[in-house]
């Protein structure tokens, strides 16, 4: 079979997507009205969930300002208000797409540059609410907007994290930016704080939100996570957090942070162990054998807990994590592997050039790339089909999804050939398997042995 880029994605018989097809579009820092306007494009590309930026009260045009809450009791930010969010949810529901919300529960906005107290939202915003009561009452999710939500007694003492290897330190003190920055006021999970955060989550759930990405969950104690996320709130919801680690089982940060979170919360998480496996396998000197079965060695999360990814918003936007950015071809190979394999909910990151000064517009409208849409079609077509490893080596990994699909990822600069024994690895005979990235490339099984050619630095994904 001839093909062109390290990916072979061959699918036989384009079967109807199953109801639980689950690719998530991370519409990072998109205005809510933009998500609504692009609803048909999102549906047409095959996404089943959309993750939106935090729906709360925040100010400032920078992306990071969305992660500095001023008030949880209403939705009003440069990205949109409650009416915009309602329209977004309605548009997605009409197209069978679930909406997930990024939620910030660890801290509040750092406003030490303009005031000395810890009353939130504070005198300035309370004055704005009072001056325009009709508007702000329409943005309200819960609570009394005539008084503050939080006071100094609802926060841990002032102080910055200095020991990033100590969970107690990381979960008690503040995230700070250095150079005298006082940091993000860290919430104390007292009864009042917990009750207000529960009210916030219940209000979003009542609006039709179907999942929560818990921001900065690494900085929240097990007690706080389990106190806030009651069985009632979690019922029918996809809840997952981002705990950045450098690897899986055996790595210090996994054992101290991610493993306890998984063991004690019952929630899902970004699959940083698998991401580390991808980076290692695709990197110089790495072997694709690492991707044959990483979960068997604790280097991938269980599929029912994992949100898999090739990049998250924290990686390009934080200097300390930028070393994890894959080169553009490797990122494409990573997506092919993630969207071809069984296990986890793949997340696709798409922004508006928030790191344009360093990366150009690399991820702007990424969600609409034609090759990515082909991979998503493959993912949806083979969803629920069992995964079976066929072979792997330093350059490639090759596996099948039932009899419907075949995935090969070749990281090397030259073609990889594999003779597939169809008596051992059953495929449908006399049916065309077409590469979803190159429709002219076809495999038709007519004998026991079939030659599979995995082109250089390109992932072929073939479906019947």
Curated annotation (Swiss-Prot):
Against PANTHER family, the record matches this protein to: ALPHA-AMYLASE
Q: Where is the active site?
A: 215 (nucleophile), 242 (proton donor)
Q: What is the lineage of its organism?
A: Bacteria, Pseudomonadati, Pseudomonadota, Gammaproteobacteria, Aeromonadales
The GO molecular function terms of this record are: alpha-amylase activity; cation binding
Q: Which SMART domains match?
A: Aamy
GO cellular component entries: extracellular region
Q: Where is this site: Transition state stabilizer?
A: 314
Name of the protein: Alpha-amylase
Q: Where in the cell is it found?
A: Secreted
| Keywords of this entry | Carbohydrate metabolism, Glycosidase, Hydrolase, Secreted, Signal
**Residues that hold substrate according to the record:** 107, 213, 218-219, 247, 313
This protein's species is Aeromonas hydrophila
The record's top EC class is hydrolase
Name the protein family.
Answer: Belongs to the glycosyl hydrolase 13 family.
A single Gene Ontology biological process assigned to it is: carbohydrate metabolic process
What SUPFAM superfamilies does this protein's entry cite? (Trans)glycosidases (SSF51445)
What Enzyme Commission number(s) appear in the record?
3.2.1.1
What's the superkingdom here? Bacteria
Q: Which reaction does it catalyse?
A: Endohydrolysis of (1->4)-alpha-D-glucosidic linkages in polysaccharides containing three or more (1->4)-alpha-linked D-glucose units
Q: What would be one Pfam family of this protein?
A: Alpha-amylase
Return the InterPro entries for the record.
Answer: Alpha_amylase, Glyco_hydro_13_cat_dom, Glycoside_hydrolase_SF
As given in the record, the signal peptide range reads 1-21
